[in-house]
């Protein structure tokens, strides 16, 4: 009985768990003046391809630096440079993949 209850609880929590992007990115970014949508398009304007954009985001999140930030000087002076992510490589890749899927309009046009 306890075993069945435990399995049901695990299945229920798994089904209702937010994805990596929602859990690790959206909560903090919701408080910022620049939206995730806007940041996505800034990356896309500079890096163009999916591969280059994802690599640039992951690189920045692992080692944030003002010199490679996509944000304006005003934003960085006000908000500052974020701290390096504590996500594992797998979690980070998954979150960036979801970010790409949510905001990429190119695939939605086809």
Task: Report residues per predicted region.
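Sec-dependent N-terminal signal peptides
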Residues: 4-13
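Boundary at the C-terminal end of the N-terminal hydrophobic targeting segment
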Residues: 15-19
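Stable alpha-helical elements in mature extracytoplasmic
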Residues: 21, 53-57, 91-95
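Short beta-strand and adjacent turn/loop elements
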Residues: 22-23, 87
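Gly/Gly-Pro-rich "capping" loops immediately C-terminal to redox-active cysteine motifs
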Residues: 26, 30-60
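Axial heme c-ligation environment in periplasmic c-type cytochrome domains
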Residues: 36-45, 62-95, 107
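Short, low-complexity, Pro/Ser/Thr/Gly-rich segments in the mature regions of secreted, periplasmic
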Residues: 97-110
């Amino acid at each position: 009985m306890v075993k069945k209850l435990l399995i049901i609880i695990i299945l229920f929590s798994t089904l209702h768990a937010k994805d990596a992007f929602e859990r690790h990115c959206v909560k903090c970014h919701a408080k910022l003046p620049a939206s995730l949508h806007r940041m996505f398009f800034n990356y896309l304007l500079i890096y163009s391809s999916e591969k280059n954009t994802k690599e640039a985001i992951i690189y920045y999140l692992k080692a944030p630096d003002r010199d490679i930030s996509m944000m304006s000087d005003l934003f960085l002076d006000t908000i500052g440079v974020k701290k390096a992510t504590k996500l594992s490589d797998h979690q980070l890749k998954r979150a960036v993949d979801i970010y790409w899927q949510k905001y990429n309009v190119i695939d939605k046009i086809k």
